[in-house]
Amino acid sequence: MNRTIIEKVRSMLCECGLPKTFRADAANTAVHIINKYPSTAINFHVPDEVWFQSVPTYSYLRRFGCVAYIHCDEGKLKPRAKKGEEKGSYLINRIVSILYTIGIGKTSSPRKASHLGIKG
């Protein structure tokens, strides 16, 4: 299983062009996705369904590294959404409390956001 996770992380980071600093977020997302799909170890049942005894939802899943716009309330005449650098902000993962981790720009650290528009 460890090799599977590492391979998914490597491919996710290569596909969207994110730096290695996002490895932990990519690993978290990879494990989250693995737990949402059927597993041969438990007779093709979904691990989340077995653990929580309810059908998992997939509607919130987005492509790793897609462009995301954070809703801002900085003032009446200021822009209502922030986008990262030219490559875009990076949507990393949806967390249990309906927060997304967003990395904006090259130097800023990832932020958590709940009000955002997602493109892609």
UniProtKB/Swiss-Prot annotation:
InterPro entries: Retrotran_Ty1/copia-like, RNaseH-like_sf
Keyword Mitochondrion: yes
Localisation: Mitochondrion
Top-level taxonomic group: Eukaryota
Alphabetical keyword list: Mitochondrion
One GO term describing the cellular component: mitochondrion
Protein name stated in the entry: Uncharacterized mitochondrial protein AtMg00710
Gene source species: Arabidopsis thaliana (Mouse-ear cress)
